[in-house]
């Protein structure tokens, strides 16, 4: 068994813990200190929409026994990784055309690298977090952590039988904190769990594991419950501007940073519940899970970006962009966003697709994912309506005789195709006749 993963608490050694301030990490930090480890707490500011006071979290960590507690601002890096994912179309999970924008995998890529980098500055080479052995995050953090620090070892309280025996549930953890003088009140038990960052929110587990429970039990944290009749959602026009593949304006307004642009995109999309989806997906270990997702800003920017992509690039480029995006989305989901094969796909899309994407798209947003595109403007468009106008135009790029030649040359294989179908009929692979899909094939 690998000695990278520690199954028992390393007594007397520095242990970095990704500290959220919630019940699990609070109890784990105090427990590790009492058992003889030297815990260091690291909190990632990812712009979580449900977090009210980031600065209070390190103070809480110190109260629970942290040797040192640091707040790491990850928002700028997260915003740029989100833009990179949009530029590459790095999204492989969708249902009925509604996309999951890989917001949790993007958050883990940033958290895993930036927190471990901060730990290295403090000479902390053991890392713990709250991910369980059944999920994706345990593998994502493992990869990003070791990628950042090859000397890293990993200790997870939730893989330590002693911790599980003593503090195996929420009730036990709450009682442990109270017994040690902390007035910890458990929050009301929700029907599902939520994890979020600035790019999106994930709702899963508990009642949402049952497919007869759906979006109607979820209380959105980034927008409105658009499915409810008592929620008023007014139609709204919004114009998104891109320069060289980078979103730069919303309704003509520029922003001081990518973070500020994302926050405004979230506000606009959130007013409509844009970007919410219900997905059944394959986890890394090939077992299926179910999640309900929010990503209002990502959805808004993605729609506008893809509209410009289709207006600017040719069919083969768009096809390759989509194929590469599906593959890159899987790599991102698997915790391989910074692997060479992912960087190769990213560079291809960002250089040869995104660089040409300059322009503005105006949309009307309604309820949920209901929207219309009202206008598309770009100096780089290869869409020229006069080429295919149904009206008579002067200096037309081609005439009827040109099309006759194209039809002849482009379809020389019709005879070959008919002969092949005849072979399939002769061998019994196809049946001809009145009720078959090729009823006239046997007629010469």
Swiss-Prot record:
It catalyses: L-citrulline + L-aspartate + ATP = 2-(N(omega)-L-arginino)succinate + AMP + diphosphate + H(+). InterPro entries: Arg_succ_synth_type2_subfam, Arginosuc_syn_C, Arginosuc_syn_N, Arginosuc_synth, Arginosuc_synth_CS, Arginosuc_synth_type_1_subfam, AS_cat/multimer_dom_body, AS_multimer_C_tail. It is found in: Cytoplasm. Gene3D superfamilies: 1.10.287.400, Argininosuccinate synthetase, chain A, domain 2, HUPs. ATP binds at residues 18-26, 44, 130, 132, 137, 195. Keywords: Amino-acid biosynthesis, Arginine biosynthesis, ATP-binding, Cytoplasm, Ligase, Nucleotide-binding. The keyword Cytoplasm applies. NCBIfam families: argG (TIGR00032), PRK05370.1 (NF003779). Homotetramer. Belongs to the argininosuccinate synthase family. Type 2 subfamily. This is Argininosuccinate synthase. It comes from Histophilus somni (strain 2336) (Haemophilus somnus). The lineage of its organism: Bacteria, Pseudomonadati, Pseudomonadota, Gammaproteobacteria, Pasteurellales.
């Amino acid at each position: 068994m690998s000695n990278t993963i520690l199954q028992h608490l390393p007594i007397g050694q520095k242990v970095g813990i990704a500290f959220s301030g919630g019940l699990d990490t609070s109890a784990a930090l105090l427990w590790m200190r009492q058992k003889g480890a030297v815990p260091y707490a690291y909190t990632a500011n990812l712009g979580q929409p449900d977090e009210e006071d980031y600065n209070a979290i390190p103070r809480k960590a110190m109260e629970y026994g942290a040797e040192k507690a640091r707040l790491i601002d990850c928002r700028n890096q997260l915003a740029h990784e989100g833009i990179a994912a949009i530029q590459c179309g790095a999204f492989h999970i969708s249902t009925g055309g509604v996309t999951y924008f890989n917001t949790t995998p993007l958050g883990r890529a940033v958290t895993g690298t930036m927190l471990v980098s901060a730990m290295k500055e403090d000479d902390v080479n053991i890392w713990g977090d709250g991910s369980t052995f059944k999920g994706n995050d345990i593998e994502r953090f493992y990869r990003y952590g070791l990628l950042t620090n090859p000397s890293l070892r990993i200790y997870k309280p939730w893989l330590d039988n002693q911790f599980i025996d003593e503090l195996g549930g929420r009730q036990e953890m709450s009682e442990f904190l109270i017994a040690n003088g902390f007035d910890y009140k458990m929050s009301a038990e929700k029907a599902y769990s939520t994890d979020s960052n600035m790019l999106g929110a994930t709702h899963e587990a508990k009642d949402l594991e049952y497919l007869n429970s759906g979006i109607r039990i979820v209380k959105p944290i980034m927008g409105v419950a658009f499915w409810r009749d008592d929620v008023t959602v007014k139609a709204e026009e919004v114009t998104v501007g891109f320069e060289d593949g980078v979103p730069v304006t919303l309704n003509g307004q520029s922003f001081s940073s990518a973070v500020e642009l994302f926050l405004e995109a979230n506000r606009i999309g959130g007013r409509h519940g844009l970007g919410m989806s219900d997905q059944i997906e394959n986890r890394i270990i090939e077992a299926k899970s179910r999640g309900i997702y929010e990503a209002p800003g990502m959805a808004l920017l993605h729609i506008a970006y893809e509209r410009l992509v289709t207006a600017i690039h040719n069919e083969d480029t768009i096809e390759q962009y989509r194929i590469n995006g599906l593959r890159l989305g899987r790599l991102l989901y698997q915790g391989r966003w910074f692997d060479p094969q992912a960087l190769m796909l990213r560079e291809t899309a960002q250089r040869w697709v995104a660089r040409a994407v300059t322009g503005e798209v105006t949309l009307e947003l309604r309820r949920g994912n209901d929207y219309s595109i009202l206008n598309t403007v770009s100096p780089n468009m290869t869409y020229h309506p006069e080429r295919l106008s149904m009206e008579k135009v002067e200096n037309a790029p081609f005439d009827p005789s040109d099309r006759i030649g194209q039809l002849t040359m482009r379809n020389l294989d019709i005879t070959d195709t008919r002969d092949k179908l005849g072979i399939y009929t002769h061998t019994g692979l196809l049946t001809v006749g009145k009720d078959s899909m090729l009823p006239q094939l046997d007629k010469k």
